[in-house]
Design a protein with these regions (language model features):
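Hydrophobic-ligand binding "helix-grip"
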Residues: 29-33, 37-44, 55-103, 111-113, ...
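Hydrophobic ligand-binding cavity/cleft-lining segments
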Residues: 1-47, 133
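A conserved amphipathic terminal alpha-helix motif
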Residues: 111-144
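Structured catalytic core of nucleotide-sugar glycosyltransferases
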Residues: 4-5, 17, 54, 64-66
Length: 144
């Protein structure tokens, strides 16, 4: 899973406020298109998810997967696939937040592997669509 796709957006909100939106995983269906359900299965001492199950509808593919999360304060969160779905066989993602002139720059990086053979360019285009949609939804949610 060496190839990763990433994109960034500047959000007019503090890092802590944006990370609070990101950390509220069970609310993702309200603002992240394609996410049907998220269930937190285990939390850490800070109340943030350590493990969860994500169900998504991604156009031609729908799946449910298990994810493990690693949090670095309000600076970064990463997640890894720990329970494969019927379609998704590998997944790694991160949100990295950095202060940027009156706002916060949020960079979302994603790599997804699927059982269905897919040309790299098509796979990256799909990842880019997921990332851009998530960043726009995050911006709307955090700036409201």
């Amino acid at each position: 899973m060496a190839d990763r796709t990433s994109s960034s957006i500047t959000i007019k909100a503090a890092k802590a406020d944006i990370m609070a939106v990101i950390a509220d995983l069970e609310a993702y269906p309200e603002w992240a298109s394609g996410i049907r359900e998220f269930t937190v299965q285990e939390t850490g001492p800070d109340g943030r998810a350590l493990r969860g199950r994500l169900t998504f509808d991604g156009g031609p593919f729908s799946d449910t997967v298990g994810l493990a999360y690693t949090w670095d304060g309000d600076d970064r969160v990463s997640w890894e696939l720990v329970e494969k779905g019927t379609v998704v066989t590998g997944l790694h993602g991160t949100y990295a937040l950095a202060e940027a002139g009156g706002g916060t720059e949020v960079t979302y990086e994603l790599a997804v592997d699927v059982r269905v053979p897919m040309i790299g360019m098509v796979k990256r285009k799909g990842e880019k669509r997921i990332i851009d949609s998530a960043l726009k939804g995050l911006k709307r949610r955090a700036e409201r």
